[in-house]
């Protein structure tokens, strides 16, 4: 019989000659540190061993990982919980473990470099002091709300007492990441220093002994009084509800739990925190948000093709417009890759350079970047009106007008001027990639790479191989997207690809509701209340009414009359309305020099143009149902036809590309939640009410008959 070897501990203690202990957190076999349930015993053990040292003066907690302190708790622990009580117990274990650090008899200081998030920041908050590195990789935050949860190991109680209730609520409710200098200003850390002296600074802080707690700013002290507290929580609750529309229960519970701790004491706060954590862990919203987290994490590790990607050294971009400028920006500033832009004139190149300058300047103004770093990143972007420098690029991303012959010409010119290995990636939103590659000498190196506007903010790209695109080209294009900070889904070369294909029927149904006399604001409000970030009419104005009408004929030609856009769009376009970009759309936009309106107002002349009298007659839930059911039906068709590789990819595409409500997990998770049989019955009812275009697709009918789901039960 062989004796089973104990797992190596993630917490290693070293006692220095000056009697200061250094606890190094290094989870074996993992790239980053995440906190796991089994670490409770390991933390207990390391603290007991430290206590046994008779002359111990203090402890410093550091990470053994190169650029990560603790990335958070391992959320697979939550999936293992089957009841709220089990999840509550998990939170209580975390609380009691960190309470041991907080109650330790000598000073404990956290030396933070890299990501310090979720349970990682809660651990740091339990320490008696915190210092962090000034490195760009250092970020502190409590992002649990983004998983439909709240910090469950004391974060809702310690943070308000450290930096004040208003700033703590802002951090916890948004899940935002705080950089080093901002953390210092907030009082979240006691010092921020270069990484090279981080450990020494933490040791010096321990040697200074117990420090008196930093006094909160007078504004925060004012808000601690009964009147200030009542006012603060009233304002926060109102603002939060305006953002969440009541769709995210975690936000309301965070406010309640923080208030409980401040009103009834920290012990009551911990009790409320653990109970709320347990209950939130069992909500469908948290399950959906966690599924998106796992899906996006998995996608970031996938290559997209059965081949190794080629090395990427330089990138070329054709076109310096809005899309070209945005692509250049993310390639240089996030990917760290030199970019060469070609445009027909200097104005286009300057436009692209200004795009990156404006994005980086915003970071400089908010003190998230130094001017020297902005200059360094701008140096990565250059431009030319000819193809000089293109013989060095590995991928060329084409972002010119939506014209097939022009794009084919671009392919020919790149094959002439670039290296034989250069990949041609087209940022088309509607043209078939196979047609763009039709005259190519190396069609296996032509692919679609569809970005969404604004490029620096939208996280999704669609990677679109055509019939003869090579696996190496797919893998290299996905690798480039990852470098740009994007989540990539590989979709088939079919009309509209995936995102635009499911978006078109959704927008068309909103237009039909408009033609029935439903006011513009009422339509948008219905879908925002449902959970979309903006309504369908606002979205059309933002994307461009002309862009929407260009995609529609392609969809009708290849997929049939159900994609025919209502005549309303043609009438609006003929009136010279393209949306926000030309200041004329479904909404009013202030002209230059005019003051911006606090709330957007619909342009009532649109009603005259369309010959309708606006009157709200449909219930908000009915409007949302009509629009969303069209999207769900089309998403199921896309899966059936192989446009997307999996329900997972379809959910990520809809949430990251359109803003499908994250708390529903995406179209496929939502259909599972409703039950496919109910989806089919709803579509059949709408079909009887409004027409054949609501007919449920074969995939949904088949699944309903057989009682099937898109995801396994409990996954």
From Swiss-Prot:
One of its GO terms (biological process) is fatty acid beta-oxidation. Pathway: Lipid metabolism; fatty acid beta-oxidation. It catalyses: a (3S)-3-hydroxyacyl-CoA = a (2E)-enoyl-CoA + H2O; a 4-saturated-(3S)-3-hydroxyacyl-CoA = a (3E)-enoyl-CoA + H2O; a (3S)-3-hydroxyacyl-CoA + NAD(+) = a 3-oxoacyl-CoA + NADH + H(+); (3S)-3-hydroxybutanoyl-CoA = (3R)-3-hydroxybutanoyl-CoA. Residues 1-194 are annotated as: Enoyl-CoA hydratase. It comes from the Bacteria. InterPro entries: 3-OHacyl-CoA_DH_CS (IPR006180), 3-OHacyl-CoA_DH_NAD-bd (IPR006176), 3HC_DH_C (IPR006108), 6-PGluconate_DH-like_C_sf (IPR008927), ClpP/crotonase-like_dom_sf (IPR029045), Enoyl-CoA_hydra/iso (IPR001753), FA_oxidation_alpha_subunit (IPR050136), FadJ (IPR012802). It is found in: Cytoplasm. PANTHER family: TRIFUNCTIONAL ENZYME SUBUNIT ALPHA, TRIFUNCTIONAL ENZYME SUBUNIT ALPHA, MITOCHONDRIAL. In the N-terminal section; belongs to the enoyl-CoA hydratase/isomerase family. In the central section; belongs to the 3-hydroxyacyl-CoA dehydrogenase family. This is Fatty acid oxidation complex subunit alpha. The gene is fadJ.
